[in-house]
């Protein structure tokens, strides 16, 4: 165990105290970031590089114009997929892993009516129900914390959030009363907009205590001697010896697509798709810190989110010379209406006294979430009837935006989410995705396929790119942990079999490797030393908060193995 050393920072955006209502930046990022649909087995085998290949209904997520290339009468397809994954975490040198066994699940169902200018005209139609992405994940991480490193405890974070809320409202009436310990340890405080719930959970469980001389809060885990028994000149704040984080997530996004394709001539095709999306997400987490003398703190969270939204996509394909096909596509953001509910409980033990507190049974609220724009370019070269090679490029904009769902105007109101949206724009940028695919026809009945996909990290702010964050992020209520994804790579293989003229079977295997960094709680600036600051000092820039750096990131690697099968029938 070591003693906390505070470092003075400079005044900048990342040093400003946070609005109490701005707590959903990371939730919006988690739910609104791009997800990779499995699609059909052919789509999976080509790693999604089907923007200029088309024909398959799954290709409409890359370019809706592709469905106009299906020239059969009707086709029904059903796709199932399953597999397993391993989630590994390394935290302060301690490695842990968790295996998740899978089962075969629904991936896609589709119906197509193809283009036939002789009998139907140049218009094609497609309908599909698709698993557009799953949130399933399980992380178990443990750390033996070093004696000499500079880090802070969740108790320090709770105290800083309390001090910052008080600093934000120094000139508000009754603010002193609202932050008295006798008040924030009552259930009435949960209904007070001035008081963060992390303050109530920390004070109620005995993690934090007030320094009556300065009016600021600090960690309650105070010690008079070092671990070896050497006396301190004065009681000092202690840090934990060990930490544990268990995180479980599950849920999925289901897309319902209706698409039309138009074949202007043999070389030029257009398409449009309407997508309705249903989102379900559940999270449960447990965090624990162990201090000297059998003292500890614990935090438990559960959260559920449901949402429904819609988007549209447009695409075109052009064949400038025989065998070469080029495509472009544009997809609007998905506009979600979201409902969230959560519960949290905290426990603490210090000096043989154990305390606990829980949030109200229901903390339901609603908001609106606008997703990202997406732009795509694609190309494919067909080698007669022997096969093809294809390449797709996607750019997903970093334009997530939260708004208040109680407002009726078209784009909603940012009231209560101004800071979240500002930080989403500052911290995250666009994602670049490259897909490569190839198909070789061994005969008229058998095809072999392979593919590769790479996606860049959406993290833009350099102060969030290291193992220790050096700027604040806004977390959702007491669920203070957050994850920042790094790059993603996936590799795929597959085969297609024409069993009869009307029946076909496609198979695929996909291996993906995703890296991420998970933080137990955010970096934060503590304004507790300036609760008596004058307006003149604030205007003169003399307020320089203490930096609490949090803990080192858990370096996470998720490896997934997936098998996909599609059965299609033409009629």
Language-model regions: role of each:
Residues 47, 51, 62-65, 568:
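Short amphipathic alpha-helical segments enriched in leucine
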Residues 43, 57-58, 64, 364:
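Generic secondary-structure boundary/loop-capping signal
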Residues 16, 48-58, 423-427, 482:
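Short, charged, low-hydrophobicity "junction" segments
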Residues 1-27, 571:
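Bacterial Sec-dependent N-terminal signal peptides
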Residues 25-50, 68-87:
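Transmembrane beta-strand segments of Gram-negative outer membrane beta-barrel proteins
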Residues 67-68, 84, 266, 278:
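Glycine-rich nucleotide phosphate-binding loop and flanking beta-alpha elements
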Residues 23-38, 44, 114-571:
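Outer-membrane beta-barrel porins/channels
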Residues 54-62, 68-147, 254:
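Outer-membrane beta-barrel translocator/receptor signature
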């Amino acid at each position: 165990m070591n003693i906390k050393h505070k470092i003075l920072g400079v005044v900048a955006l990342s040093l400003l105290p946070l609005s109490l209502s701005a707590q959903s930046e990371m939730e919006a990022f988690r739910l609104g970031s791009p997800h990779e649909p499995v699609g059909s087995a052919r789509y999976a085998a080509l790693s999604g590089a089907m923007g200029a290949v088309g024909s398959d209904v799954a290709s409409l997520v890359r370019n809706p114009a592709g469905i106009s290339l299906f020239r059969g009468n009707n086709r029904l397809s059903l796709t199932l997929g399953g597999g397993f994954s391993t989630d590994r975490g390394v935290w302060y040198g301690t490695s842990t892993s968790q295996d998740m066994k899978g089962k075969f699940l629904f991936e896609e169902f589709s119906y197509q009516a193809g283009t036939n200018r002789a009998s139907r005209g140049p218009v094609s139609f497609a309908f599909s129900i698709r698993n557009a992405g799953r949130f399933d994940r399980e992380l178990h991480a443990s750390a033996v914390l070093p004696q000499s490193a500079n880090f802070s405890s969740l108790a320090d974070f709770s105290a800083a959030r309390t001090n910052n809320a008080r600093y934000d409202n120094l000139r508000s009436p009754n603010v002193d009363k609202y932050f008295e310990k006798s008040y924030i340890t009552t259930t009435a405080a949960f209904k007070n907009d001035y008081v963060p719930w992390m303050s109530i959970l920390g004070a109620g469980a005995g993690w934090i205590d007030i320094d009556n001389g300065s009016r600021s809060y600090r960690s309650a885990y105070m010690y008079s001697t070092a671990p070896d028994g050497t006396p301190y000149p004065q009681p000092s704040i202690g840090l934990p010896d060990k930490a544990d984080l268990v995180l479980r997530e599950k849920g999925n996004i289901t897309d319902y697509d209706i698409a039309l394709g138009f074949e202007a001539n043999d070389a030029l095709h257009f398409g449009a798709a309407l997508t309705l999306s249903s989102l379900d997400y559940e999270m449960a987490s447990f965090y624990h810190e162990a201090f000297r003398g059998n003292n500890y703190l614990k935090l438990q969270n559960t959260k559920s989110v449901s949402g429904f939204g819609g988007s549209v996509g447009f695409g075109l394909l052009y064949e400038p010379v025989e065998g070469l096909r080029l495509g472009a596509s544009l997809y609007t953001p998905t506009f979600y209406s979201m409902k969230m509910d959560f519960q949290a409980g905290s426990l603490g033990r210090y000096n043989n006294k154990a305390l606990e507190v829980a949030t109200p049974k229901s903390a339901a609220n609603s908001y609106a979430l606008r997703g990202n724009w997406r732009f795509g370019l694609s190309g494919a070269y067909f080698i007669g009837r022997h096969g093809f090679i294809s390449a797709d490029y996607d750019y997903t904009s970093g334009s997530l935006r939260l708004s208040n769902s109680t407002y009726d105007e078209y784009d909603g109101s940012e009231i209560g989410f101004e800071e979240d949206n500002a930080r989403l724009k500052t911290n995250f940028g666009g994602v670049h995705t490259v897909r490569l695919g190839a198909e070789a026809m061994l005969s008229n009945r058998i095809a072999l396929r392979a593919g590769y996909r790479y996606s860049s990290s959406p993290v833009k702010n350099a102060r969030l790119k290291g193992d220790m964050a050096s700027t604040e992020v806004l977390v959702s209520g007491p669920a203070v942990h957050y994850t920042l994804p790094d790059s993603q790579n996936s590799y795929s293989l597959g085969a297609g079999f024409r069993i009869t003229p009307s029946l076909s079977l496609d198979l695929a295997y996909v291996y993906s490797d995703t890296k991420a960094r998970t933080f137990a709680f955010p970096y934060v600036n503590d304004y507790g030393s300036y609760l008596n600051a004058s307006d003149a000092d604030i205007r003169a820039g003399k307020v320089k908060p203490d930096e609490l750096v949090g803990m080192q990131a858990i370096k996470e690697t998720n490896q997934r193995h997936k098998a996909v099968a599609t059965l299609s029938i033409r009629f």
